[in-house]
Swiss-Prot record:
Protein name: Salivary protein 15 Iper-1
Functional summary from the UniProt entry: Salivary tick protein that downregulates host immune system by binding to both dendritic cells, and CD4(+) T cells. Specifically binds to the CD4 coreceptor on T cells. This interaction prevents the activation of the Src kinase, Lck, and its downstream substrate Zap-70, and results in deficient activation of PLCgamma1, the repression of calcium fluxes triggered by T-cell antigen receptor (TCR) ligation, and a subsequent reduction in interleukin-2 production. (Microbial infection) Protects Borrelia garinii from anti-Borrelia antibody-mediated cytotoxicity in vitro. May facilitate B.garinii transmission in mouse model.
Tissues of expression: Expressed in salivary glands from feeding female ticks. Highly expressed 4 days after start of feeding.
Claim: Secreted is one of the keywords in the record: yes
Record has Transferase as a keyword: no
InterPro entries assigned: Salp15
Organism: Ixodes persulcatus
Length: 135
């Protein structure tokens, strides 16, 4: 059980590194799915079509978010990169947790994000349903 948890943590960290690098390129913000046997499994619902692309897009939103109250960088390079967690995506409220160096922030999912098995999207949050992991 402990090795499974450790492996999941390693996989999630690997995803963040790959997604952050892909998000930093101007050509494509999406992470291409792995072609090997080491595919990362996300806890997103089945109605989200491409979990890797979805996670990459959330990471891009998190990276690009700049709060108005945050002071501009003084030119020094920060080693902390923004992060997301697949367990902190709320499909009922169409939000996700963005972990930042200067504190965490809850951001809205894009309006075209699926939020239910019957083609509901975050454009109409009142029709969204909560995700039950494993279902």
């Amino acid at each position: 059980m402990e090795s499974f948890v450790a492996m999941k943590v390693v996989c999630i960290l690997f995803l963040f590194v790959v997604a952050a690098e892909a998000a930093s390129t101007k050509e494509s913000p999406a992470v291409n799915p792995s072609k090997g046997k080491d595919r990362i499994k996300f806890n997103f619902p089945r109605y989200v079509p491409n979990h890797h692309v979805f996670a990459s897009n959330l990471l891009k939103l998190c990276t690009e978010y700049t709060p108005e109250t945050q002071a501009r960088n003084d030119g020094s390079q920060a080693t902390y990169k923004p992060r997301i967690n697949d367990l902190q995506v709320n499909f009922k409220n169409c939000t996700f947790l963005c972990k930042r160096e200067f504190g965490n922030v809850t951001l809205n999912l894009p309006v075209d994000t699926p939020c239910g098995p019957n083609k509901q999207t975050c454009a109409d949050k009142s029709k969204c349903v909560g995700h039950i992991p494993g279902c």
